[in-house]
Amino acid sequence: MTTSVRTRFAPSPTGFIHLGNIRSALYPWAFARKMKGTFVLRIEDTDVERSTSESVDAILEGMAWLGLDFDEGPFYQMQRMDRYREVLKQMQDAGLVYPCYMSTEELDALRERQREAGEKPRYDGTWRPEPGKVLPEPPAGVQPVLRFRNPLTGVVAWDDAVKGRIEISNEELDDLVIARPDGTPTYNFCVVVDDLDMRITHVIRGDDHVNNTPRQINILRALGGEPPVYAHLPTVLNEQGEKMSKRHGAMSVVGYRDAGFLPEAVVNYLARLGWSHGDAEIFSREQFVEWFDLEHLGKSPAQYDHDKLAWLNAHYIKEADNARLAELAKPFFAELGIDEAALAQGADLAAVVGLLKDRASTVKEIAENAAMFYRTPAPDAESLAQHVTDVVRPALADLAAALKTVEWTKEAIAAALKATLGAHKLKMPQLAMPVRLLVAGTTHTPSIDSVLMLFGRDVVVGRIEKALV
């Protein structure tokens, strides 16, 4: 019987979740969807001092925005403490763990001596019970840690889906602390129990976890489990070549939403940030799931390129439905001081978006460029003096008169402009610039006929005539 694929995303809610973090959700999500398996969300919140509910919310919000739906969870490690203690008790009863009374100061001194002797700093097994070995007397009033009896010989090995065969000698691994003096279990132990209980078949995570893997495999086998398939993803670097982090200026996942990026663009970009399908650059979420495999995960660090993401976002904006973009733009209008009432009274927002979206790389840019349709223009005196000259004023008056009666279409408006230019022997910029300035408040707009059509007859004629009084 074939085992159903079960993957997981297991973030620690200790702050900021950036693109490098969320990629470790995207790939296991895609693999689970491709294999018709199960995607599990687990919140590893055992670092009580640093874990916050705000960080959990940011994780859930970021995943929801990108459409990374999970089938089971979220499971919280702090809510599973009874289960961890149960397994610890089983391990104690089986002789798989032992109490260690070595103090932090003693351990630090031991490691310093080892470093001075040119040895690898590691716990030396002072309190590890062995046949015929006499252990020190436990110090009074000291609560011990619990250490896992790591095998002393042999190797722990796995075939990593990204890095290939990895073998670590057990002699290199000391006996890991799996429970603190107060009885709370440690990270590596909780991870193993969770992966075992949740029947995880594939662990796709960052390669900063490679060093944890041999320890986790040994604990897993001691508990009677078999290791999952591991795929350790190379680091995501920022544009300066440093590991992506908040400290080095990374933006949060929802920060991209708040900057006007579309989720489909971010998913497409993230998919290519460490995986490839031939030369394909642009593909839908459905294509990504269909194509995704572990064999084509990159083996080298991937470097973030903001310009590439902006280019992808511009592509998806061009493809997006105008009504959807109009809704997404509303919060950005609010930031510009333009409320829903102003939007309702002004030009049709979906039509405005349709005119402007080909020039924008973010939804925020669309709102900024569209603001002129929902504000009263306030051109400065210098611009008015430069463009609304005595030479052009008669042409403006004739144009306003013509626009009162023409059919209100782009073609009819263009014809009225052309006729006015011919009658007054003007070039297009001589007329279009002042018209733009008086109607929109700026000399920089898309094609003048399209802009005037969206402003509407009453607004266009009224603003031109007001300037001529």
UniProtKB/Swiss-Prot annotation:
A motif ('KMSKS' region) lies at residues 243-247. Residues 114-139 are annotated as: Disordered. CDD domains: GluRS_core. GO terms for cellular component: cytosol. It catalyses: tRNA(Glu) + L-glutamate + ATP = L-glutamyl-tRNA(Glu) + AMP + diphosphate. Transmembrane segments: none annotated. Its EC number is 6.1.1.17. A motif ('HIGH' region) lies at residues 11-21. Its main location: cytoplasm. GO terms for biological process: glutamyl-tRNA aminoacylation. Gene3D superfamilies: 1.10.10.350, Glutamate-tRNA synthetase, class I, anticodon-binding domain 1 (1.10.8.70), HUPs (3.40.50.620). Residues 114-131 have a biased composition (Basic and acidic residues). It is found in: Cytoplasm. Keywords: Aminoacyl-tRNA synthetase, ATP-binding, Cytoplasm, Ligase, Nucleotide-binding, Protein biosynthesis. ATP binds at K246. Belongs to the class-I aminoacyl-tRNA synthetase family. Glutamate--tRNA ligase type 1 subfamily. Monomer. This is Glutamate--tRNA ligase. The lineage of its organism: Bacteria, Pseudomonadati, Pseudomonadota, Betaproteobacteria, Burkholderiales. The gene is gltX.
